[in-house]
């Protein structure tokens, strides 16, 4: 691993690292916030997944999460949103290719060689964080938009791995909305049954009651993508039918930007702390 930058922040350390990923077959960067040490107990981790066009730095520089994370004693880990590099398949659109990995394992050429973000987030990155930093094995996950989709599918596909999950303006039924249809048809092929494995609503309907974990979703009602791309009410109905402990908050006037995230990130960190710090 190579340390790219480091900054003292609220008596903790904000760092950016590069490492060679065997899962993605390319170098990857991630950002991490290490809160000031409190005692000899390793702190828990919150993984944050960002949205389309983003990298590991958007949340770090725009969300203002470090102050509360330092207070609570929670490590923040921000991976990139896709594999990167000249040898990595790409597309001219903002919603496919680099910066738009959708947190799945691609099965179709040319994407399958590198686009295995699900395996990277499930296995390689947590193992790296565990081995290189003083952290506990308790973790939660959160994200925004495409990253909210990622957080939800990571939690739904891995019962017992996370204490809680939250999301801001998540894509919840990618099989049925333009962003998801475009990405899934390219990454996964035309078999729509294969798409269901990466769709939060489908995964929610297939879930077992004993696997449910506390879930918080915030959605601005002035979000330009709300009607066509996000549709959180569809997931809320699935959660209702499955008696899944999910809170959906519609926030009046808020849009899809990081100003929205910055306004409510403290709520999300305190929500996760209830379960991470048990």
Swiss-Prot record:
Keyword Hydrolase recorded: yes
Reaction it catalyzes: S-formylglutathione + H2O = formate + glutathione + H(+)
Gene name of the record: yeiG
GO BP of this protein: formaldehyde catabolic process
Functional summary from the UniProt entry: Serine hydrolase involved in the detoxification of formaldehyde. Hydrolyzes S-formylglutathione to glutathione and formate.
A single GO cellular-component term on record: cytosol
Superkingdom of the organism of origin: Bacteria
Protein name: S-formylglutathione hydrolase YeiG
Organism, scientific name: Escherichia coli (strain SMS-3-5 / SECEC)
Gene3D superfamilies: alpha/beta hydrolase
Leading EC class: hydrolase
Keyword vocabulary terms for this entry: Hydrolase, Serine esterase
Family statement: Belongs to the esterase D family.
GO molecular function, one term: S-formylglutathione hydrolase activity
